[in-house]
Amino acid sequence: MNNKLYGIILCFLLALPAWKLGKFFPLVGGPVFGIIIGIVIAILLKNRAKFDSGINFASKKVLQYAVILLGFGLNLQTIISVGSSSLPIIVSTISTSLIIAYILAKLINIPTKIVILIGVGSSICGGSAIAATAPVINAHDDEIAQAISVIFLFNVIAALIFPTLGDILNFSNKGFALFAGTAVNDTSSVTATASAWDSIHNTGTQVLDSATIVKLTRTLAIIPITLFLAVYNSKRSSNVNNFSLKKIFPMFIVYFILASIITTVCNYFIEVGVITENISITINNVFSFFKHLSKFFIIMAMVAIGLNTNIKKLILSGAKPLTLGFCCWFAISLVSIGLQKILGIF
């Protein structure tokens, strides 16, 4: 472990300012600042060899730990009861993004792993989906950084223009919550977009609460998609006859599901009064700590990814991934608006 310590400490220390900057500029978010800081420090870093094993550990294992802890933010009971009404639109937008990504991959010849990362990032939950998918498909750090950067760009655009667009289209509060929850990629940007609407229309946290639940419902798609990709990736890269689900099954996704179940069961016991008030406060504080730790681990992993990123390669290969990201984002927005219009939601 000692040979990893230097790199882990470096990533931890660099993640601190990235996390703080993410608090000040939520539209950008800590993960993006983490990548930027990592890229800058990588240019300045000398005697890099002693940091490499720790940096690689942070970019892979810490990323998986972040996904596991993410499960403690998912109360499956609440999501199922409230989010089920948005399911048709969620399924349609996810399907649209993945189909668009697949078609464009063939038309403009984008590397498969970048296509997958941008496709799932656009359709599910931005950086968290990319974090969950990257280890499953063995994505390189350059590819992860590129996908995160593309998702970030369209998150910012969405947060800036969607509240005004919602007014132009005469969205109801319910309609805009559903639009923000399905058409904005990352949870932090969904929060920013929905909060902006609440501020403009003096609706307290009504739209924010609903949009967050829609977003968390989308997040559940991480589970089937990562499992499918694990099977697909294994069959592509090895002999089909030697294929074993047990060998390729991403265990961190199992722990993610387990964390979600633990959260759901504990919340149920709190609601029915089985658990005393003092214990319930402690449990909620622990879950809150895990959720915050998950966010910090993602930032720490993004710092490591930034440190491993070839900036020249990232810039030179940027046009096609941007085109893919725009097409996925635009198509998701159109489908969300169109289906709401057809279903009479707004």
Swiss-Prot record:
The lineage of its organism: Bacteria, Fusobacteriati, Fusobacteriota, Fusobacteriia, Fusobacteriales. The keyword Repressor does not apply. The chain crosses the membrane at residues 5-22, 27-49, 62-81, 86-108, 115-137, 147-169, 216-233, 248-270, 283-305, 315-337. It is a multi-pass membrane protein. It is found in: Cell membrane. It comes from the Bacteria. This is UPF0324 membrane protein FN0533. Keywords: Cell membrane, Membrane, Transmembrane, Transmembrane helix. One of its GO terms (cellular component) is plasma membrane. Belongs to the UPF0324 family. Coiled coil: none annotated. Pfam families: Cons_hypoth698 (PF03601). InterPro entries: UPF0324_pro. Its main location: membrane. It comes from Fusobacterium nucleatum subsp. nucleatum (strain ATCC 25586 / DSM 15643 / BCRC 10681 / CIP 101130 / JCM 8532 / KCTC 2640 / LMG 13131 / VPI 4355).
